[in-house]
Every structure is written in C-alpha cells, then in structure tokens.
C-alpha cells in the first residue's frame, strides 16, 4: 500500500474523529500482503448514567435519527461505477455511503434528556440492530411503514437503482444513525432535546412484550419472520457446496 494512501486514510480518520474529541494515537506498523487496520477505542463515561443497548421496556417508543437506507443506495450506485459528477440523489447516496456522519451531538443530547432507556447505532440495518436492542430482555417491536422517513428523493433513487425502499431502510446498514427506545412518560423531554438534532428524529414504532419484530405495511398487510429484509450478518452460515 503506498505511503500516500496510508497518510490519506489517517487524515480522513482524524477528520471523522475531530467532532467527538477523539485523538488518534500511534501503534504497531508492519508489512503484510494486504492492508489491515485494527483499531481500539479507549475512553471513560462522564457524570450520569450511560445509555446502553439494554433497558428497553414494553410500550417504549422507537425513534431513529436521520434517514436510514441512503448508504444502501450509495452502495448500489457505486457498484455500477462511480459517477464523475454526481448531483441530486446520486450525490446524497454517495455521501451517505462514503462519508457517513456519527451522531455525536444527537447521542449526547438524547442521553441528557433522561428519556432514552436504550440506544444503539444502526450499522447492520435497522432490523438487525433493533433485534440487539430487544433480545436481551426477550422483547419485540411493531413498526409502521407509513411513519418511516422515506423522502420523495429517497424513493426516486430507490426506483432508479432497482432497490426496494423498504429493504434499503430496514436492512441496509452502515448508516450509523441512532435507534432509541424512549419512555412514553418522558416523551416531551425527548422531543425538546430532539429539536437540537441536526439530523432530526422520527418515531417509527414501539416496543412490545411479545417477542419478534412485525412491520405494518401502508396497505395494512404485515411483514414478519422470514418475510422481513435481512441486515448484515457478522457470522453468516457457510454456503453449501453444489456438485
């Protein structure tokens, strides 16, 4: 790997880390057949109780920041060749996939509101990460498609790329938006905090006592179980060999 490429990677990492106050430190460097980066983040929790991915309860309201799914559309676009002068939805899709923004400000404000019981970033897709939010306590969720933040531009991009917008939104991943379980009794406090979110926040469903995730379509039908889009799997089952 050229030294210039490595320098560019570290400059990009520094730019991405700057809003959080994270400082990049040196480490072991060695030669290998391919470029491999191994990163460790070390820090401390300040005053107050940290918000983890555990703690959701039945009846909690589910909110997500930003517009998940754009990164999935960006990947589909780039697989067809990188546009030389992207504009409109093409530029938005490429930005979402190549330069995602961590929601530092939103996370801090949400935690300070005292209304968020559990929180996780959307890196593997909403359905996969929502499962992580619910599985420890054996809970489920009901989501409503009509409330998903899918803009006209998002739907136009999905149609142009041949990607189901529901699949992109629920299973895309690499958006790094925040998915939060909000206590209903403290919803007003959360909404006050959300006014300061640059990315905004949208209510997409609620936590249920019954396990499993169900999605109510706009036409009134339901998606659940194997019919749901799948997100990224870190340990997918091995493919069967065909003779």
Report residues per predicted region.
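Glycine-/charge-enriched secondary-structure boundary and capping motifs
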Residues: 1-25, 30-37, 42, 112, ...
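Short, conserved glycine- and acidic-residue-centered signature motifs
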Residues: 6, 55, 103
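Glycine-centered structural positions embedded in regular secondary structure
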Residues: 12, 43-45, 74-75, 79, ...
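A glycine-rich, Thr/Ser-enriched phosphate-binding loop motif common to dinucleotide/cofactor-binding enzymes
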Residues: 35-37, 95-103
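Phosphate/diphosphate-binding glycine-rich loops and adjacent basic-rich segments that engage nucleotide
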Residues: 46-99
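Hydrophobic side chains in well-ordered alpha-helices
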Residues: 50, 74, 106, 130, ...
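Short, flexible, glycine/charge-rich loop motifs used to bind or transfer phosphoryl groups or to couple energy/partner
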Residues: 52, 109, 169
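Internal active-site segments that recognize and position negatively charged phosphoryl groups
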Residues: 62-66, 99-126
């Amino acid at each position: 790997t050229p030294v210039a490429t490595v320098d560019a990677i570290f400059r990009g990492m520094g730019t991405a880390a700057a809003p959080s106050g994270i400082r990049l430190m040196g480490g072991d460097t060695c030669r290998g057949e391919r470029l491999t980066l191994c990163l460790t983040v070390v820090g401390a929790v300040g005053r107050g109780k940290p918000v983890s991915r555990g703690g959701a309860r039945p009846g909690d309201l589910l909110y997500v920041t930003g517009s998940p799914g754009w990164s999935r559309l960006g990947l589909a676009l780039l697989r067809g060749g990188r546009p030389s002068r992207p504009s409109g939805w093409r530029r938005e899709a490429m930005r979402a996939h190549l330069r995602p923004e961590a929601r530092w400000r939103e996370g801090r404000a949400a935690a300070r509101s005292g209304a968020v019981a559990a929180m996780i970033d959307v890196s593997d897709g909403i359905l996969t990460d929502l499962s992580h939010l619910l599985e420890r306590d054996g809970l489920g969720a009901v989501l409503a498609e009509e409330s998903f933040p899918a803009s006209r531009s998002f739907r136009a991009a999905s149609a142009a790329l041949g990607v189901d917008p529901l699949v992109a939104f629920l299973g895309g991943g690499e958006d790094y938006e925040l998915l939060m379980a909000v206590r209903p009794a403290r919803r007003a406090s959360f909404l006050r905090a959300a006014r300061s979110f640059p990315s905004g926040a949208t209510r997409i469903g609620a936590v249920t006592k019954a396990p499993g995730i169900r999605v109510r379509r706009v036409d009134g039908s339901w998606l659940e179980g194997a019919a749901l889009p799948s997100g990224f799997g870190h340990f997918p089952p091995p493919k069967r060999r065909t003779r």
